Curated annotation (Swiss-Prot):
Transmembrane segments: none annotated. Ca(2+) 1 binds at D773, N777, M779, D784. This is Alpha-actinin-3. Spectrin repeats lie at residues 288-398, 408-513, 523-634, 644-747. Pfam families: CH (PF00307), EFhand_Ca_insen (PF08726), Spectrin (PF00435). It comes from Bos taurus. Keywords: Acetylation, Actin-binding, Calcium, Metal-binding, Repeat. F-actin cross-linking protein which is thought to anchor actin to a variety of intracellular structures. This is a bundling protein. SMART domains: CH (SM00033), EFh (SM00054), efhand_Ca_insen (SM01184), SPEC (SM00150). GO terms for cellular component: brush border; cell junction; cell projection; cortical actin cytoskeleton; focal adhesion; plasma membrane; Z disc.
Length: 901
């Protein structure tokens, strides 16, 4: 006959002796009877000895004992006797026969009795016990030990094993060289057992004389003292424990549980102290969180207050280098100074939400930050900071472009002004000469023609002067910092130009008057002058154009310059022919002079330009053409590099931007419509958070490309709609969103565990909340909240609904969050500590007196929390109290906001 028994409501393990779910959780996890463990002879030996000693400690009360655990229980008689002793109940009369079926019947009666106590023994049958199966016999005894010796051990709502471990940790915490973390290796040196005995019976052991390097001596001391003075039989061998790498956990638990029961009478005061410590710890932790919030909020607001004026300062710098230093300072701010503050702001919101949740769960009044430090105040200040930051960056880039333009215009102005001043040098003196008065007719006509050529040259320079004036005007409009010197130079050029015009007109009038007196003019020299002057102007213009500086921002603009230069080069053959024709005129003059024996004039009376001048300028043009070719190709290469940078940045930004947007929407959907258990939701969110963190390298690479663009002074990108600022803002929004959503789920876990909610209840609450969350923003407006309550069966009048709103919306924000909704739905059924419970706990510590002394507090509570109570408790004002008596009733009421501390 095979019996499958298990304690009802015990454990969730999956071993052959594992239990189900419920209050007796001592069977879960490593409490499962692992069959493979018995393959270790050392563990089998320890369990056999320990379990035998444990059984004998109870059987001796009935005047019997066992010697061989797998043999002495085979007939079921001593097994039934053991159950009667430890339970205090009578079992059915055993069968007296010695046949196998009699033994099986007796064992089954014992197993039936175990089953009647809510214990399920999976895979253990009476036949295996009767057959002397050591593994099954040890498993059955271990289950009996769990049910009758360990199951009822509970410390602060923990499972049996966890409660026993926590009890051991608390009792041994003050002792040196003792660190109880488990029921195997933590007990090998014997100090933990000695500490347990010394904690409750300091008169039995001199703990100060114990040495950690003498484990066998320590263990034997504990065993002997326990057996002699505490009536706890020796269940273990010191040598087995020391020489085994990992002593058997169940043997240790069985032996340690005997100490727990031996010292159970001293636990009432400790339980009361634990309750007070728990309440005080909650209060102290909340106060610490409040102080941290105030400190973080003050520091963040102070940083914003200092930073905003700097970002709002729009005073420009006169030089490009100074503005670039400002831009570098701004980059350092975005890269080094702001990210930690973003993290602080996010952490501040998380701390605030966590604090409010803890206050609600512990029935403390809601935390109201000091004036100006609300989360909304910080959010408003942060928005102001970001607005100032965006305006500051736009202003910086605009100023840099303006200074670039100014620098280019100033260089162009100086170049053209220098060329013009070089051209006009001596022209006023030349126009003021009166040489025509003593000249011959031919010389006068030559002077006239020369003057005509000058006027042609002067007219050709009119555009240059107008261009110089236009450049000066543009520099003034762009607020050039050296505008005064530019204006002064431009005014001097314009005044000189007007004077040149006046002098030119006066000289023409004089020469035309003299022309009537003169008849001969050398036509060839005139022809030379007429053709050489415009060609010379063309040469000057060509030199000026070839030396001209440019400012381009794209490949297309550079290609346009290259095309214009190619077109100019195409005109060079025609210009060379014109040069040959002009030089041919001079050759003709020399030929005529040679033919007729004339003495050629050393100068052309119509023009000062010589053929050598034309050849020199022509050579200059020929040399400048390849130089400009090289410069244009270098600029084209630079612009092509910039274009590749633009495309590289755009390719990443066009991938990152939609990814961030998709993640933001995905997080929003997760927050609004979460399914599964809170742990599953948290795991999903943590996975999302890790995915987002892992994606940070893409943002860093994009920042690097953006840095290269800025260093190359590239400020536009037609290949993408995403700027670095868009990516940064989206990234910060994504980090904040995932952190806030994780915090909401953590708070729901706190609420669920504190209120005892099931996952089905949470899912039902979430479904109702989502249905009435019209805007899908995680909050219900008052009308939607009222409709939700009505749909759930609440009959609400105006006064009652107003009362409920003050509970779920204490700050009068006009919305109801999901956390507040859950708090309301579970408020009346929650099992929490109260002021009355704390008063009752203090009364136990005070020995039933209405007051308590500082000495009693220091004796029963940890030092830190005892001093905390002494500082905050008011003196007891009742009659018959000694000096220094403290009022613990008023103090307990103040902890829950029912009075002032």
């Amino acid at each position: 006959m095979m019996m499958v028994l298990q304690p009802e409501g015990l454990g969730t393990g999956e071993g052959p002796f594992a239990g189900g779910r419920g209050g007796g959780e001592y069977m879960e996890q490593e409490e499962d009877w692992d069959r493979d463990l018995l393959l270790d002879p050392a563990w089998e030996k320890q369990q056999r000895k320990t379990f035998t000693a444990w059984c004998n400690s109870h059987l001796r009360k009935a005047g019997t004992q066992i010697e061989n655990i797998e043999e002495d229980f085979r007939n079921g008689l001593k097994l039934m006797l053991l159950l009667e002793v430890i339970s205090g109940e009578r079992l059915p009369r055993p069968d007296k026969g010695k046949m196998r079926f009699h033994k099986i019947a007796n064992v089954n009666k014992a197993l039936d009795f175990i089953a009647s106590k809510g214990v399920k023994l999976v895979s253990i049958g009476a036949e295996e016990i009767v057959d002397g199966n050591l593994k099954m016999t040890l498993g059955m005894i271990w289950t009996i030990i769990l049910r009758f010796a360990i199951q009822d051990i509970s410390v602060e709502e923990t499972s049996a094993k966890e409660g026993l471990l926590l009890w051991c940790q608390r009792k041994t915490a003050p002792y040196r060289n003792v660190n109880v973390q488990n029921f195997h290796t933590s007990w090998k040196d014997g100090l933990a057992l000695c500490a347990l005995i010394h904690r409750h019976r300091p008169d039995l052991i001199d703990y100060a004389k114990l040495r950690k390097d003498d484990p066998i001596g320590n263990l034997n001391t504990a065993f002997e003292v326990a057996e002699k003075y505490l009536d706890i039989p020796k269940m273990l061998d010191a040598e087995d424990i020391v020489n085994t790498p990992k002593p058997d956990e169940k043997a240790i638990m069985t032996y340690v549980s005997c100490f727990y029961h031996a010292f159970a009478g001293a636990e009432q005061a400790e339980t009361a102290a634990n309750r007070i410590c728990k309440v005080l710890a909650v209060n102290q932790e909340n106060e610490k969180l409040m102080e941290e919030y105030e400190k973080l909020a003050s520091e963040l607001l102070e940083w914003i207050r200092r930073t905003v004026p700097w970002l709002e300062n729009r005073v420009g710098e006169p030089s490009m280098s100074a503005m670039q230093r400002k831009l570098e300072d701004f980059r350092d701010y975005r890269r080094l100074h702001k990210p930690p503050r973003v993290q602080e702001k996010c952490q501040l919101e998380i701390n605030f939400n966590t604090l409010q949740t803890k206050l609600r769960l512990s029935h403390r009044p809601a935390f109201m930050p000091s004036e100006g430090k609300l989360v909304s105040d910080i959010a408003n200040a942060w928005r102001g900071l970001e607005q100032a930051e965006k305006g500051y960056e736009d202003w910086l880039l605009s100023e840099i472009r303006r200074l670039q333009r100014l620098q280019h215009l100033a260089e162009k102005f100086q170049q053209k002004a220098s060329l013009h001043e070089a051209w006009t040098r001596g022209k006023e003196d030349m126009l003021s000469q009166r040489d025509y008065e003593t000249a011959s007719l031919q010389e006068v006509r030559a002077l006239l023609r020369r003057h005509e050529a000058f006027e042609s040259d002067l007219a050709a320079h009119q555009d240059r002067v107008e261009h110089i004036a236009a450049l000066a005007q543009e520099l003034n409009e762009l607020d050039y910092h050296e505008a005064a010197s530019v204006n002064s130079r431009c005014q001097a050029i314009c005044d000189q130009w007007d004077n040149l015009g006046t002098l030119t007109q006066k000289r023409r009038d004089a020469l035309e008057r003299m022309e009537k007196l003169l008849e001969t003019i050398d036509q060839l020299q005139l022809e030379f002058a007429r053709r050489a002057a415009p060609f010379n102007n063309w040469l000057d213009g060509a030199v000026e154009d070839l030396q001209d500086v440019w400012l381009v921002h794209s490949v297309e603009e550079t290609q346009s310059l290259v095309t214009a230069h190619d077109q100019f080069k195409a005109t060079l053959p025609e210009a060379d022919r014109e040069r040959g024709a002009i030089l041919g005129i001079q050759g003709e003059i020399q030929k005529i002079c040679q033919t007729y024996g004339l003495r050629p004039s050393s100068t052309n009376p119509y023009i000062t330009l010589t053929p050598q001048d034309i050849n020199t300028k022509w050579d200059t043009v020929r040399k400048l053409v390849p130089s400009r070719d090289q410069m244009l190709q270098e600029e084209l290469t630079r612009q092509q590099v910039n274009e590749r940078l633009r495309r590289q940045f755009a390719a990443q930004a066009n991938a990152i931007g939609p990814w961030i947007q998709g993640k933001v929407e995905e997080v929003g959907r997760l927050a609004a419509g979460m399914a599964g258990s809170l742990e599953e939701q948290m795991a999903g969110l943590r996975q999302q958070e890790q995915n987002i963190i892992n994606y940070k390298s893409n943002i860093d690479r994009l920042e690097g490309d953006h840095q290269l663009l800025q260093e190359s002074l590239v400020f536009d990108n037609k290949h993408t709609v995403y700027s670095m600022e868009h990516i940064r803002v989206g990234w910060e929004q994504l980090l904040t969103s995932i952190a806030r959503t994780i915090n909401e789920v953590e708070n729901q876990v706190l609420t669920r565990d504190a209120k005892g909610l099931s996952q089905e209840q949470l899912n039902e609450f979430r479904a109702s909340f989502n249905h009435f969350d019209r805007k899908r923003n995680g909050m219900m407006e008052p009308d939607d909240f009222r409709a939700c309550l009505i749909s759930m069966g609440y009959d609400l009048g105006e006064v009652e609904f107003a009362r409920i709103m003050t509970m779920v919306d204490p700050n009068a924000a006009g919305v109801v969050t999901f956390q507040a909704f859950i708090d309301f739905m579970t408020r009346e059924t929650a099992e929490t500590d109260t002021a009355e419970q704390v008063v009752a706990s203090f009364k136990i510590l005070a020995g039933d007196k209405n007051y308590i002394t500082a000495e009693e507090l220091r004796r029963e509570l940890p030092a830190e929390q005892a001093e905390y109570c002494i500082r905050r408790m008011a003196p007891y004002k009742g009659a018959g109290a000694p000096a220094g008596a403290l009022d613990y009733v008023a103090f307990s009421s103040a902890l829950y906001g029912e009075s002032d501390l």
